[in-house]
Every structure is written in structure tokens, then in C-alpha cells.
């Protein structure tokens, strides 16, 4: 049973539910991370994966941007490969590379060897959620997971990939093996997110980081049914749900279909697509989130202010065009070299508009 809090004053929860917020809500993907000196100090004592599985550390890292930036939502400090690790997959997160899989999944036997999540393995993550719920006050907590397609790509490629060639080859040449893999990863994703919901997160976001590598037809055939099952299973719990990918302009309509009507749903938009255009592509009842280019934050305050004002204006046009609501965010994660002071000023600016 969920221990979700009642947060009627939250601008973020109002916007994603299609209500009028008291101000434009803002938070940032990767707001907790390498751009913060306090995070870098903590990471000198803990590896990335170790930090994800130590409740007090994960709680502290999640809280750091809340204290510094006064954003309208916290997002749990974790990583999309955490449920894979909890299922016994031998992997590591390598600095400046990303997740690296010791034994990539290439055969039916490899797929069969993937185990369900060990509940004890994710207990520290859920303990972190409970610590955060107690500490966050009126700030909502977003839980998250990677979408099945993106997890599959890491497993099949063995790590990050430019072209996702092995992934697409399995998908197209061995569809039975592919769907068996996706079924297992969908089960892992559901279990991981259900645990977070029961521990008290106020919303969830599913990151399909590599979905933009697919054509719309391939996305609908090989990825969407599995992501849709994730959202359908979670829908009964009533938490707002966000679906995000990079380079997904042509997929936005399909991504919005993954969450059925009757649930507060959001589609994240990257900087390549105008929010007003995105509003015309998504299903009715869908709120939008995004979409300042993270690189703009490196260009000096005049450029940041100009671009942020334009994004907020575009978000309002999107709502006028039919989007259910709007949340300011970046079009992808905060870059490590970003000046935290710029983010502090950006939050203040967005709140003033």
C-alpha cells in the first residue's frame, strides 16, 4: 500500500494533474550530480553504484539540490541500471563511460538467465525513499526507472552505443528472443517502480533514453507494448507518470499513448522540438515537460535568461494549444560542467515568470 503524502500546494503536482499551479514548476533531470561540489565531495567516498544502494547517501544526494536550488520536485538519486544489478546482472558504472555489462545478452540462454529482482537487493533504495519522504516536507519526490527498451540496449550492447546495431539486429532478426528479453525487463521495471510507489514516491518518471534511435514503426512494434504494460500496471496506484526520451520528436504521440486516459500523464520533450508543436502530437490530457537545451546553461546568463523566457512562453503556448499542463525542465540532464549558481538563478527566474 502506498504511503503517498497529500501535497495540495505543490505546483509540480498541480501542473502534471492538469490543474493550474501557483507558479511555473521547475526541476532538472540530473539536478543531483556532478555539477554540485557537495556531491563531488561525497562521491570521493562512494562509487556511483554503492551510493545508490546506501540509503543515507542516496537521501543526502537527493536533498542537495533541494537545499541549493529550491526546485519544485526532488528526484530520487539512483540509476536506471539499479534494477538490473538487483536482478543479479554483473555490471558497473564506469566514469566518463556509463554502465558497462560484464556479460552482454546475446542469446536465448542469456535471456533465460536473467532473474527476477531480489526484493532484499532493492530494500536500500526503498529505505532511501522512506527517509526522503520524512525529510522533504512539502516537496514531492519523483521515483524513476529506465524503460525496457533502453535497459535492453545496455544489456545487448554491453554498454552505451552510438548506433545500437546489436540491439536493432536482435530486435529485427530474432523477434521472439527480443520480446522474451523485453518481457523480463518489463517485469523488472514494474517491480522496481511498484516498490518506490509503495515506499512513498509522489510521482514516477520512465526514462527511455535511447528510444529516439527507433523509427516510429519499430517503436510501436518492438518497444511501445512493453512500456505501455509498465504504465498500465502502475496506473491503479494513481501516481502521476512521465514518459521521457531523447530525440523522440516523431515518437511523442506514441509515447503519450503508453499512458492510458484517466491517469495524470506527462511527456518529456527535448530541445529539438518546440513545446507547442509537441502539444499537437501528444494525446489529449497530456501535460508536457521540458525543454531548455542543457548546453545553454554554459553560455552565460544573458543567453540563459533569453532562452528560458522563450521556453516558458512556448510552454504557455503549448497549454493554450491543448496540453494539460506544463513543467519547466531541461531537454536532457544537467551537464557536469554547469555552474550551480546559474541553476539557482534559473529557478528564481522561472518562478518569477
From Swiss-Prot:
GO molecular function, one term: uroporphyrinogen decarboxylase activity
GO CC term (a single one): cytosol
A Pfam match: URO-D
Subcellular locations according to the entry: Cytoplasm
GO biological process, one term: protoporphyrinogen IX biosynthetic process
Keywords from the UniProt entry: Cytoplasm, Decarboxylase, Lyase, Porphyrin biosynthesis
Pathway assigned in UniProt: Porphyrin-containing compound metabolism; protoporphyrin-IX biosynthesis; coproporphyrinogen-III from 5-aminolevulinate: step 4/4
Site keyed Transition state stabilizer: positions: 79
Reactions catalysed: uroporphyrinogen III + 4 H(+) = coproporphyrinogen III + 4 CO2
Binding site for substrate: 30-34, 79, 154, 209, 332
Oligomer and partners: Homodimer.
Family from the record: Belongs to the uroporphyrinogen decarboxylase family.
Reported function: Catalyzes the decarboxylation of four acetate groups of uroporphyrinogen-III to yield coproporphyrinogen-III.
Protein name per its UniProtKB record: Uroporphyrinogen decarboxylase
Lineage of the organism: Bacteria, Bacillati, Actinomycetota, Actinomycetes, Mycobacteriales
Name of encoding gene: hemE
